[in-house]
A protein has these predicted regions:
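Helix-loop-helix junctions that connect adjacent transmembrane segments
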Residues: 9-10, 14-16, 53, 130-136, ...
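Transmembrane helix-loop boundary segments of multi-pass membrane transporters
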Residues: 42-53, 121-137, 156-167, 295, ...
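C-terminal membrane-solvent junction of multi-pass transporters and transport-like membrane proteins
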Residues: 162, 331-341, 383-436, 446-450, ...
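Membrane-interface loop-to-helix entry segments
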Residues: 137-185, 199, 217, 240-245, ...
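Membrane-interface "cap" regions at the ends of multi-pass membrane proteins
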Residues: 1-51, 64, 68, 470-488
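Membrane-helix boundary/coupling elements in multi-pass transport proteins
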Residues: 103-119, 216, 221-228, 290-330, ...
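TM-loop-TM module centered on a large, flexible mid-protein loop between adjacent transmembrane helices
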Residues: 85-92, 125-129, 239-308, 328-378
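Extracellular loop-to-transmembrane helix junctions
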Residues: 36-132, 448-463, 475
Length: 488
């Protein structure tokens, strides 16, 4: 027998502290919709062009398909480890647990650049004067990193309440802003953005879909709060659906308004959108005046901060859950703050590593490019996490639910398998694209993108399977218990 970590016996996360609404905005804030509107949609528009709204819709539907796995698992498992615990508990030997955890660590250690480096990139795009001050971006990185620690450290109730309040306001600004722009467009409104492209533009359109999928990353993170949600087996799945719907409401109308607002607002052809500094802000200023311009700036900045808080909540609980299981992380990562009942050790370790990594790459490539390089890894790694969990759902259904008469061919076999195939296609297309780009334009930056894609794939395949083999061979007793904790 292996002695259980002390933390599991003496202290637990604060059960009942998170309501359904707060859980919804844990996921919604991770998406960072205002930041997507202001900045991240650039990648989608660069490839999908006028069909960007359709690309967003397709990506949203694909992510909805990926949400089936956490929705189904949340009915049967209440564990802060989320996809890690779902995957680990899918089989008796827990084989998928280490694979899922390593994959997710790849996203954990790279995706935070959206907040830590993205904030500086956004502010720099607003003001050439500010961007000209050497190393000022490091100050912004320090500020947001400290914020990302303090609010989650003080308690899950405080951090989720902050995200719920600001998230509702952010949603209203985006929806109302989009509606006003659409109304002001008048006869310029068109169905063209929803027309499926033809000919040589089809490939570019689907690459735009790939970028759009990244916009919805994090919608499943409410599952990391499952141990803190009262009656979580009912409320988590409800929160997942609501968050997914709200993300679509926030981004789909906004993408339509921005695309047509740009092409009809005197800014030139849509091909110039991706190369413009903060085009979302330019469109808001054109149609909503200084008030709309300032509001989008305020809520975009807040979007980076709320994303950071949501990210810290999620990552710290994943690492806490794994440390509790004694998988990869040492016991001290699984200790909770005695008063706040938050995984403060996990928060400090993760943010410390993340900050150092972001600053190093920021010094080499600049904050904006470094952030995009790291986000490339985050996208590949999180897709791998979904793929492992999808496989886990099928195995769990076969091994457990089938015997209980609860297995579903559609939800547990067809849907997750389809989602996994889509994930494989996305990773393949990303690799093929980066190879093509580098060989047509062999710059050091394009080389960095190609290297990070290859590294990300190897991280999952070699790192993940290697760790899985290690636990199955050397520590099978730990692998078997991984992910089995259930707060309910």
């Amino acid at each position: 027998m292996v002695e259980e970590p002390e933390v599991a016996e003496t202290l637990t996360l604060k059960k009942g502290a998170v309501s359904t609404v707060r859980g919804v905005f844990q996921s919604f804030s991770y998406v960072g919709p205002a930041a997507d509107v202001a900045i991240l949609l650039l990648g989608t528009v660069a490839f999908a062009l006028i069909a960007t709204p359709l690309a967003i819709i397709v990506a949203w539907l694909i992510y909805g398909l990926w949400m089936i796995t956490p929705y189904e698992f949340s009915k049967y498992r209440t564990n802060a480890g989320s996809y890690y615990s779902y995957s680990a508990g899918a089989t008796k030997n827990g084989a998928l647990g280490p694979l899922s955890l390593v994959s997710w660590m790849g996203e954990n250690l790279s995706g935070q650049s959206f907040g830590i480096l993205g904030l500086a990139g956004f502010i720099f795009a607003i003001s050439s004067y500010i961007s000209g001050i050497s190393y000022l971006w490091i100050v912004f990185a320090i500020i947001i990193t400290v914020y990302m620690f303090i609010l989650p450290y003080l308690g899950i109730k405080l951090s989720t309440e902050y995200m719920a309040i600001t998230g509702i306001m952010e949603l209203l600004v985006l929806v109302i802003g989009a509606v006003i722009i659409i109304i002001r467009l008048g006869s310029a409104n068109s169905a063209a953005p929803f027309a499926f492209p033809s000919g040589g533009t089809v490939g570019s359109f689907f690459f735009g879909v790939v970028f759009s999928i990244v916009d919805f990353t994090g919608l499943g993170t409410v599952t990391t709060l499952s141990e803190e949600v009262k009656d979580s087996r009912k409320k988590i799945k409800r929160a997942l659906v609501i968050a997914w719907v709200l993300a679509g409401v926030a981004l789909i109308p906004a993408s339509y308004a921005l695309v047509l607002g740009w092409t009809n607002g005197g800014f030139g052809a849509i091909t110039g959108y991706a190369g413009a500094p903060d085009p979302g802000l330019l469109v808001f200023q054109k149609y909503l005046g200084p008030v709309g311009f300032i509001l989008l700036i305020i809520f975009t900045i807040n979007s980076y901060f709320s994303y950071g808080v949501s990210k810290t909540n999620a990552v710290s609980r994943i690492w806490y859950s794994a440390a509790r299981d004694q998988v990869i992380f040492p016991k001290f990562i699984g200790k909770l703050h005695p008063k706040n009942k938050t995984p403060s050790n996990a928060m400090a370790l993760w943010l410390g590593i993340s900050f150092v990594l972001d600053v190093i790459l920021g010094l080499i490539y600049g904050p904006t490019n470094a952030g995009l390089i790291l986000l490339t890894m985050a996208g590949i790694a999180i897709i791998a996490v979904h793929m492992v969990a999808n496989t886990g759902l099928t195995l769990f259904s076969y091994n457990v639910l089938r015997k209980q008469g609860k297995s579903s061919i559609l939800l547990h076999y067809i849907a997750p398998s389809t989602a996994t195939i889509i994930g494989l296609v996305i990773i393949y297309e990303t690799l093929a694209s980066e190879i093509s780009v580098y060989y047509s334009d062999p710059t050091s930056l394009n080389l960095a993108y190609l290297v990070i894609v290859i590294f990300s794939i190897l991280w999952v395949i070699i790192g993940g399977t290697g760790m899985m083999a290690y636990y199955l061979i050397k520590k099978p007793h730990i692998a078997e218990k991984a992910g089995t904790f259930d707060a309910d």
